[in-house]
Regions:
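CBM-like, beta-strand-rich accessory domains located in the C-terminal region of large
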Residues: 1-155
């Protein structure tokens, strides 16, 4: 799904693993939450604040984090649908029925990869078709404290 692999560890399943410190600011058109609490202890994450901010021409997504220990590269994931173009470093072009958006990321921080996910569940395939894609942005450097910024813009 759309949550990061922190220190190489995925979000844990179960009601005790959930975001905390959720704040909705309607004036700023912003939603933020600490997703560190959605991960098991072996992720070694002290804080990971995911923020979504709606602007006039974009949706900005940022991750501000502090790790307790470095174990593995962080990987930020986005599930995508449509025609995907990774040919320009720092930009992912997504086209669906004549509508085009770009997801911008810092090419100096991440290496992109794309995985095809076949949908066999009719509840999903009836909506999304036979496949979706997982864009994985793998951090080039392991850092204990940092900020990742992504922006989605319509063209």
């Amino acid at each position: 799904h759309n949550l990061p692999m922190i220190n190489g560890v995925p979000q844990k399943f179960g009601s005790e693993y959930k975001a905390t410190d959720v704040v909705l600011d309607k004036k700023k058109k912003q939603l933020s939450m600490n997703i560190a609490t959605a991960y098991p202890d072996n992720a070694e994450v002290e804080k990971w604040i995911r923020t979504y901010r709606l602007r006039d021409s974009s949706l900005d997504i940022s991750d501000d984090f502090i790790l307790k220990k470095l174990k593995n590269e962080n990987q930020v994931n986005f599930l995508l649908w449509g025609d995907i173009d990774l040919n320009t470093a720092g930009k992912v072009k997504i086209s669906v029925e004549g509508q085009i958006v770009e997801l911008h990321y810092d090419k100096s921080l991440f290496t992109p990869s794309l995985e095809t996910i076949l949908l066999t569940d009719p509840r999903l395939s009836n909506v999304w078709g036979e496949k979706i894609f997982r864009l994985s942005l793998t951090a080039k450097k392991m850092v204990e404290k940092g900020r990742y910024v992504f922006s989605v813009k319509a063209l």
